[in-house]
Amino acid sequence: MHSNSSSGSRLCLNSLFSSLPLKALALSTMLFPFHSINAGKTLQYNTVVNTNTLTVVAVESPTTVFKEDQFLHGFGYDLARNYAQSLNVKLDFKIVADNATALRWVQQGKANFAMTTAGLSTIENKGLMSFSASCGDTVDLQKNGLNPELSWVFKQADDPLTQTASGFVCQSKQNGVTQQLASFYNRNVVKPEAWSTIQRDLTTRLPIYKASFKQSAAKYDLDWHLLAAIGYQESYLKPESVSPTGVRGLMMLTNSTARAMGVSNRSDPAQSIQGGAKYYDQMLSEYDDIPFPDRNWYALVAYNMGPGAVNQIQKRLQAQGKDPNQWVNLYNYLQSNKTRNGRYKQAVQYVTRIRAYLEHIKTAQTRINI
């Protein structure tokens, strides 16, 4: 829950410094030595405190944010969202057409900071300052196909907001959050050479089942593109698919799940899609207390592994003193234990590929004629 008082927000901002690891805090203060605050300056820190809102501006890109319909996610977005949560304030995330506009918003005070890939000279020429959004962790960004030049850009170096943000991104690097977010938003999760086959499959098969996807999505207030992405991951949109374990149909339902969802013929595409939509809706309901976009990722893992398996992991996370409702914690657990548990490895592949397929379907609709 967000604090509605300035004092509550101010406490979170101030206490962040005291909770930072010494190394991260030292780096923050080394980069931005704390000067005595000029009372005449308009500090972004004060704006955030007074409005209880952190306003961030960015240009849509594979590294910063994906925004289509109700979907809003991405490496940069999630990092900014985590920062806002650490300050106990709301995040107001704005998307503009280009880096020049994003930098201008910071200059004009329309945004507290910008996430941008603008060059350092461009930023400095506008009288702004910046630091690496990954605290210099360019290796993890590069190996996951993300732009290592992503920066957070602020109006003033001696603003407390700038200094807490610098400490936060270095703390995120130190505790592994940066690495896990980069891994989840890996642009290479689907091999580049595979996209031509995927494009051909979607062009050929998706139009056949589009009406069923849309009808079932409307019934359960879901996004039909997401259902289609699940279907492609499950069966490549082949209704006759069957696995060695007995799951069958376009949405690859087990016998017990099919019966529970009212599906009498798993090989019937319309029935399978309806059953898959109903089951996914039930998985979303399991995690009503988790905000989007994280709720989608939890529901997808539960669709793949079963909600009982997810709930067991949540209990283990809680026992470790970690927030069980933070996607980065669940994802890290799956990643860290996938070598000893094949189901965890499968779940990681499942959710990351569906995310990639979803983004592709939404941004390639005109090219694949759906």
Model-found features: residue ranges?
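Catalytic and substrate-binding regions of cell-wall glycan-acting enzymes that process beta-1,4-linked
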Residues: 154, 299-364
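Extracytoplasmic small-molecule ligand-binding "clamshell" domains
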Residues: 37-118
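Substrate-binding/active-site groove segments that recognize
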Residues: 240-264, 271-282, 325-331
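Export/targeting segments at the very N-terminus of extracytoplasmic proteins
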Residues: 20, 186-236, 270, 287
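Periplasmic-binding protein-like
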Residues: 58-62, 127-163, 333-336
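Extended ligand-binding regions for polar small-molecule ligands
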Residues: 74-86, 146-185, 207, 357-364
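Short, functionally critical alpha-helical segments immediately adjacent to catalytic or ligand/cofactor-binding
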Residues: 222-238, 273-277, 299-304, 354
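Ligand-binding clefts/hinges and TM-proximal coupling segments of bilobed small-molecule sensing domains
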Residues: 166-204, 317-319, 367-369
